[in-house]
Amino acid sequence: STGTKLENVGVVTIGEDGRVSAKSYPLDSLTDADKTVADRAAAIQAEIDKEYGAAFAKTEVDLNGEKEPGNRTEETNLGDLITDALVWGAEQQGETVDAAITNGGGIRATIEAGDITKKDVNTVLPFGNTLSIIKITGEELLEVLEASTFCTPEAIGGFPQVSGIEFTVDTTKGYDQGDEYPGTTYFAPKTINRVTIKTVGGKDFDPAATYTIATNDFMAAGGDTYYAFAAASVNYDLGLSMDEVV
């Protein structure tokens, strides 16, 4: 891989003997920067640093943005913060929600103890996802939690970071794999075998109840292991970016 953002140029050489060699070269070592473009880029960067570099909050502990052990394997304090913020953001828009879920794979960095800047939050949530509202049944909630923890304790991008949901995963049991979700590489659960939900929104879980969930637009469209979200009876976007909500 040559990385991202056109930072490197990759050269692959295939010899007559079939041997393959690959090298990566930093792009800035191959070309001279155009002064006009470089000056403009520096000015834009200065504006960004001014806007996003100012501290607006403080944390006394590191907020865990690691993949594993972390947001793709277990509950984390950063996952709690983000999903609590989704609930708060929805309520600020006049929505009444029971809980919030975001995929652990969408959390991309740790915030170290100390001052917190907009840049920190944007680095944690870099994809521009927006806050969405869905309504699903308790049975559908069980399905997405079962599907999204199918390989736990191994890491999975869809691992559910939640607010307002108390649930457990019995990792001693295997995943009862059903049919493949259309257009994905994931499989629905044939039965609910590993996940038990205790409460949602502070009330005893009811598989027949309908729950209002705050989530992100990627998941609301069925991303990762959340195929059931795409068929939710109510599904709409509030147009608020997650990083701004947090």
Residue ranges and their predicted role:
Residues 8, 19-22, 81-246:
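Feature captures C-terminal
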